[in-house]
């Protein structure tokens, strides 16, 4: 059992971990059928001076992630932007190729896909769990968060975080919960 069950290593008011994401970006100068190059993207580039919504999920092409979690954030992207969110990222412990093909299949146009291929970000967040019971290896626990200038402002980690969890909870990391919390933050600041 995961010793950090139900308690993420990082919490509201903590800084997000510093890692480098291995991404692929389109570069027309490459030419050919696959005009993409590797690009390292740091957490500083993603979070510094920006208000960012993040949601992390167990895996590309998996049922809840594909039917509800990612499509929910994609459909409410403009609402998040209207509430002062600069960008929305989907993180999964998958490689850049899988994340690209998954977004393409779901016709994701707005949410940015962020591959955490080696699980470094998820591990440092305290959200990496074993999913060996499903043949997945290590994956991210499902959560969402709002990050202001690198500091976690809101964090919604699903309950029951344990290695080899028999269920896939999806109760609080959805886009509607995050939107409601952003409204509450704005109301309390007024």
Regions inferred by a protein language model and the residue ranges of each:
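Chalcogenol-based redox active-site neighborhoods
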Residues: 1-190
């Amino acid at each position: 059992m995961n010793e950090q069950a139900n308690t993420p290593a990082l919490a509201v008011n903590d800084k997000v971990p510093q890692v480098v994401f291995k991404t692929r970006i389109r570069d027309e100068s490459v030419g050919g059928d696959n005009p993409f190059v590797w690009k390292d993207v740091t957490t500083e580039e993603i979070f510094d001076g920006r208000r960012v919504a993040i949601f992390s999920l167990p895996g590309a092409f998996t049922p809840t992630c594909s039917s509800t979690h990612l499509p929910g954030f994609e459909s409410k992207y403009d609402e998040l932007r209207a509430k002062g969110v600069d960008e929305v990222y989907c993180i999964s412990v998958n490689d850049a190729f899988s994340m690209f093909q998954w977004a393409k299949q779901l016709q994701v146009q707005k949410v940015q896909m962020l591959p955490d291929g080696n699980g470094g970000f998820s591990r440092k967040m305290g959200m990496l769990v074993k999913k060996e019971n499903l043949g997945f290896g290590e994956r991210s626990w499902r959560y969402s968060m709002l990050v202001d200038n690198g500091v976690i402002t809101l964090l919604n980690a699903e309950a029951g975080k344990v290695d080899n969890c028999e269920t896939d909870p999806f109760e609080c990391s959805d886009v509607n919960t995050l939107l409601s919390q952003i409204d509450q933050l704005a109301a309390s600041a007024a």
